[in-house]
């Protein structure tokens, strides 16, 4: 069954009573080569079933490509799953056998990077000729990370971003990223990067991405509240960039049934069709115009045509790391090297360092 399609074509604004919809902006004036069709996917993980989730991702990617999309962005933790509502039976000073086994199952649903699932995602990007931004749960040994993977339209794995700051109970199941994975990739369709969920509220992280020249700012999230749109609009205006926010749309039946999986504090009031994550995915222009979404109705492919000329139009009067910055007053230093718990040095290296 095909997904609900929501497409915005902002490159040739129709006339209404003799006036353009957005009279201050001639969206048809851009060079056609600067138009990028982008899709954000709003759909649920197949929980605890990574192969089935990959199959679903391919179906959605195929449908987006058929609609002409060049860039497709998936939600936070789409592969591996966002364990909304689960406590892993944690309390301060207390763990349980079931909670430990819940983590074992969650760990088994995560993926290695690199690994066979990454190879399959690369093949998907190549097959459908799209740039792919995918939210995953990354497994490194026995530590998990909330991660975004990037692929180009030739199937090349470009790199990853690990969430710097998990929120609340996420910190008990996910590790922390570091400055070595805050990439912005310069591609033929624009400079692409990502920040995940509430780390989008971190001004220093956003500023680092602006300084790297980000043009298409991807924001995979798990926040479906209406206030999220205001945050995304602010980032688009602040950074003079397109913002593509992708969230899952989930009902209770998308998760395992109790007692295998319990929604803390609300399980008794939920029916199988109860919405537990309402989506709200959206695409916003550098001028703060909502091009598509927010969608709170169900699983959907939310698409818009991005006129990259809007970036210059927006930065005409506000370039946050350019003519609107004050480097003699404010500065930001970023440590981009990996932070490892253990570093091994050979005797030769130690001798060289002592000289």
From Swiss-Prot:
GO terms for molecular function: 3-cyanoalanine hydratase activity; cyanoalanine nitrilase activity; indole-3-acetonitrile nitrilase activity; nitrilase activity; nitrile hydratase activity. InterPro entries: C-N_Hydrolase, C-N_Hydrolase_sf, Nitrilase/CN_hydratase_CS, Nitrilases_CHs. Disulfide bonds: none annotated. Both catalytic activities are inhibited by N-ethylmaleimide and are up-regulated during senescence. It catalyses: a nitrile + 2 H2O = a carboxylate + NH4(+); 3-cyano-L-alanine + 2 H2O = L-aspartate + NH4(+); L-asparagine = 3-cyano-L-alanine + H2O. Optimum pH is 7-9 for both activities. It comes from the Eukaryota. It is a peripheral membrane protein. The modification N-acetylserine is found at residue 2. Optimum temperature for both activities is 40 degrees Celsius. Its main location: membrane. Gene3D superfamilies: Carbon-nitrogen hydrolase. It is found in: Cell membrane. GO terms for biological process: cyanide metabolic process; detoxification of nitrogen compound. Keywords: Acetylation, Cell membrane, Hydrolase, Lyase, Membrane. One of its GO terms (cellular component) is cytosol. Residues 36-308 form the CN hydrolase domain. Pfam families: CN_hydrolase. The active site is at residues 76, 163, 197. Its EC number is 3.5.5.1, 3.5.5.4, 4.2.1.65. Highly specific for beta-cyano-L-alanine (Ala(CN)). Low activity with 3-phenylpropionitrile (PPN) or allylcyanide and no activity with indole-3-acetonitrile. Not associated with auxin production but may be involved in cyanide detoxification. Belongs to the carbon-nitrogen hydrolase superfamily. Nitrilase family. Forms a homopentamer composed of five dimers. This is Bifunctional nitrilase/nitrile hydratase NIT4. It comes from Arabidopsis thaliana.
């Amino acid at each position: 069954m095909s997904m609900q399609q929501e497409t915005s074509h902002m490159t040739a604004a129709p006339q209404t009573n003799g006036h353009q919809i957005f009279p201050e902006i001639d969206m048809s004036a851009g060079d056609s080569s600067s138009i990028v069709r982008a899709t954000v996917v709003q759909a649920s993980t197949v929980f605890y079933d990574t192969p089935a989730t990959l199959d679903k991702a391919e179906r959605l990617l195929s449908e987006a490509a058929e609609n002409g999309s060049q860039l497709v962005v998936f939600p936070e933790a789409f592969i591996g799953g966002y364990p909304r509502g689960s406590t892993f039976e944690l309390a301060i000073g207390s763990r349980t056998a079931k909670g430990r086994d819940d983590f074992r199952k969650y760990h088994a649903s995560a993926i290695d990077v690199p690994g066979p699932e990454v190879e399959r995602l690369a093949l998907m990007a190549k097959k459908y000729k799209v740039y792919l931004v995918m939210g995953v749960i990354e497994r490194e040994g026995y530590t998990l990370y909330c991660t975004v993977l990037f692929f180009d339209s030739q199937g090349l794995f470009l790199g990853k971003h690990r969430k710097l700051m998990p929120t609340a109970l996420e910190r008990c199941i996910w590790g922390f990223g570091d400055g070595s994975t805050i990439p912005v990739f310069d591609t033929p369709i624009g400079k692409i990067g990502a920040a995940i969920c509430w780390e989008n509220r971190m001004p220093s992280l956003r500023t680092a991405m602006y300084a790297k020249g980000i043009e298409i700012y991807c924001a995979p999230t798990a926040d479906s509240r209406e206030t999220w749109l205001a945050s995304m609009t602010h980032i688009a205006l602040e950074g003079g960039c397109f913002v593509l926010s992708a969230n899952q749309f989930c009902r209770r039946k998308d998760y395992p049934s109790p007692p295998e999986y319990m929604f803390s504090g609300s399980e008794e009031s939920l029916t199988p069709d109860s919405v537990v994550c309402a989506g709200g995915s959206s695409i916003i222009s550098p001028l703060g115009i909502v091009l598509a979404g927010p969608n709170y109705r169900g699983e959907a492919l939310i698409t818009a045509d991005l006129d990259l000329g809007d970036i210059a139009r927006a930065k005409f009067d506000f370039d946050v790391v350019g003519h609107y910055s004050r480097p003699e007053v404010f500065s930001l230093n970023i440590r981009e090297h990996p932070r490892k718990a253990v570093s091994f040095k050979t005797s030769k290296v130690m001798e060289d360092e002592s000289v």
